[in-house]
Amino acid sequence: MARKSFGQHFLLDLNVTRKIARLAQVGEGDTVVEVGPGPGGLTRALLETGARVVAIEKDSRFLPLLAEVAEVAEGRLELVEGDALKVDAAQAAGGPAHVVSNLPYNVGTQLLINWLTGPFRPLSMTLMFQKEVADRIVAQPGDDAYGRLAVIAQTLCEARTVMDLPAKAFTPPPKVASAVVRLVPKAEPPPAEVVAALERVTAAAFGQRRKMLRSSLKALGGADLCERAGVSPDARAEVIDLAGFLDLARATLGGADQ
């Protein structure tokens, strides 16, 4: 039933889906956007909390089954047929919303980046990823998994792994383990122009992660940029913490006090 081309692996164990719903900390009066509900295992658990669910599903095979769930959900389940990368999630939600999803493996990272930096800013995100991707989101400086995704995600959100799942929890079982990451946006994130600069800096720095910053950031100012930011030009990207990257981003804009 699952389509490999869609990266589909379904969670059908109600004990697992209920735990994810609890970890999401949603309930009556909340709106939840769910991407890729499939046969509705997690959807049912979210509805049990009393939340309103907006489910975005690309695979039309599941719409009749989800429509049956909607019939007994007393108006709290809305179905949107479409590709989550193209659907206007803010419009679909109709207001502030949380995102809770077992994300399709092939688009999970791109969806997260869209939600972190795009016009739709969720109140919180409780997301299932491949374990490798989850590790990249919560990695710390010096970790093998530390990179651009960790810097951007942790600059904008508090991020932590809240649950690990073995492959056997899914139907069909994937070849890798999975994990649930919870991300809560920070109350005072950096201004948009600083975040845009941070994206440029991290793209350059981690694009050549084994090189010293004086080389990897050469197009942005190299050693001079590092000195203005108070960061060692002889350091490599993998050891620079969030504050260091923010200083580098601000320095590209002409200051470190934005």
From Swiss-Prot:
It comes from Caulobacter vibrioides (strain ATCC 19089 / CIP 103742 / CB 15). This is Ribosomal RNA small subunit methyltransferase A. Keywords: Cytoplasm, Methyltransferase, RNA-binding, rRNA processing, S-adenosyl-L-methionine, Transferase. Signal peptide: none annotated. Its main location: cytoplasm. PROSITE patterns: RRNA_A_DIMETH (PS01131), SAM_RNA_A_N6_MT (PS51689). GO terms for cellular component: cytosol. It holds the Pfam family RrnaAD. The gene is rsmA. Its EC number is 2.1.1.182.
